C-alpha cells in the first residue's frame, strides 16, 4: 500500500539511477537567501499568529526582521559577491514593490527566485482552492513584471500549504517545490498534470532554525555547513548530491555573524567539482535528464 502522503514514492538512495551533474560536479550547491517582508499589522488568522508575543503591532519583532532589509541584506551581498555566488532567492513578492533598491540589486546580479508567498505573514492553509489558484497567478505575474523572470518554484510562505498545493503548483506551470526536505537529490512529486519535483532545501543548514530558534553560535553554523559539504562531496563522487544553505538577512547579516558566511563559502568554493547553481537550474536539469528514469525506477519498487 502507498505510504501517506501519496505524493512521493519511496526510493532508497543506495540503488537509484546515478545522477551526473554538469561537468561531472559532485555537489550542486545553491544558496537561498530568504528575502522577506512581514506586515506591521497582519490580518487576524485564527490558525496562526506571526507575532504571538504581544497584540499587534509587535514593534520589537517587526523591526528585528526589518533590519534584514535595511542593513543585513546589503552586508550579506558583500559576502556573496566575494565568491561570485548566484543565488536563488526565496522571495516574498511584496519585497519587489516595497523595496525597489533590493529588487534592483537582485536583478543586477541575475538571481533566480522561488516564491515564498506575498508576505511572510500570510499563510496558504486557510485558502480555498480558487484563492490558492489566484495566489499562484499573482506571484507569477508579480515576478514577471518586476524581474522579467518566469516563476518556476516555491517554498511555501512560512512553509505553509494545503493538500492541493502540489497539484495547483503544477497546474500553474511551476516545476519544483522546496517544502519537501526529505532527500539529498531531487525527487518526483506526483501531481494530476505536468511534472513537479522536490529540490532539496534545508532546515538543518538554516540560520533561522539554528541561530534564532535554537540559539547556536555562528561558528557552529559554519562548522556544520562545512561538515555537510565534506560528506556530500565524498558521496557525490558516485552520484551527484544537492546542498542548500538557507539564509535570512536579519540573522546572517548581523555584524557578529557575517564572517561565518565568508568562512563557509571560502571552504566550499575552494573545491573543484562544485556546481554553484540555483534551484531553477537544478530542477530544469533533473527533469530533462533524470525525471523519467526516476519515475520508472520507483514504479518497479512499489
Please name every model-derived segment.
Residues 186, 198-220, 240:
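Positively charged, amphipathic and often flexible ligand-engagement surfaces
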Residues 2-197, 222-245, 251-302:
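Catalytic alpha-helical scaffold of carbohydrate-active enzymes acting on polysaccharides/glycoconjugates
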Amino acid at each position: 500500500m502507498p505510504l501517506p502522503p501519496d505524493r512521493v514514492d519511496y526510493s532508497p538512495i543506495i540503488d537509484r539511477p546515478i545522477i551526473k551533474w554538469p561537468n561531472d560536479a559532485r555537489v550542486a550547491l545553491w544558496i537561498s537567501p530568504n528575502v522577506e517582508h512581514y506586515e506591521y499589522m497582519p490580518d487576524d488568522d485564527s490558525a496562526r499568529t506571526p507575532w504571538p508575543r504581544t497584540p499587534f503591532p509587535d514593534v520589537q519583532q517587526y523591526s528585528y526582521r526589518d533590519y534584514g532589509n535595511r542593513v543585513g541584506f546589503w552586508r550579506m551581498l558583500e559576502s556573496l559577491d566575494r565568491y561570485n555566488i548566484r543565488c536563488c532567492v526565496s522571495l516574498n513578492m511584496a519585497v519587489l514593490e516595497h523595496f525597489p533598491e533590493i529588487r534592483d540589486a537582485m536583478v543586477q546580479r541575475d538571481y533566480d527566485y522561488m516564491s515564498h508567498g506575498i508576505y511572510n505573514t500570510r499563510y496558504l492553509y486557510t485558502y480555498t482552492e480558487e484563492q490558492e489558484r489566484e495566489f499562484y497567478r499573482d506571484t507569477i505575474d508579480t515576478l514577471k513584471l518586476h524581474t522579467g523572470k518566469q516563476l518556476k518554484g516555491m517554498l511555501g510562505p512560512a512553509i505553509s500549504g494545503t493538500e492541493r498545493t502540489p497539484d495547483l503548483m503544477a497546474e500553474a506551470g511551476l516545476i519544483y517545490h522546496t517544502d519537501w526536505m526529505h532527500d539529498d537529490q531531487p525527487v518526483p512529486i506526483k501531481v494530476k498534470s505536468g511534472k513537479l519535483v522536490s529540490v532539496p532545501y534545508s532546515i538543518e543548514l538554516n540560520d533561522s532554525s539554528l541561530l534564532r530558534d535554537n540559539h547556536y553560535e555562528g561558528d557552529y553554523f559554519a562548522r556544520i555547513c562545512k561538515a555537510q559539504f565534506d560528506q556530500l562531496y565524498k558521496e557525490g563522487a558516485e552520484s551527484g548530491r544537492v546542498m542548500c544553505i538557507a539564509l535570512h538577512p536579519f540573522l546572517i547579516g548581523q555584524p557578529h555573524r557575517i564572517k561565518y558566511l565568508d568562512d563557509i563559502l571560502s571552504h566550499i568554493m575552494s573545491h573543484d567539482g562544485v556546481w554553484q547553481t540555483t534551484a531553477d537550474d537544478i530542477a530544469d536539469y533533473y527533469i530533462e535528464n533524470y525525471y523519467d528514469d526516476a519515475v520508472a525506477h520507483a514504479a518497479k519498487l512499489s
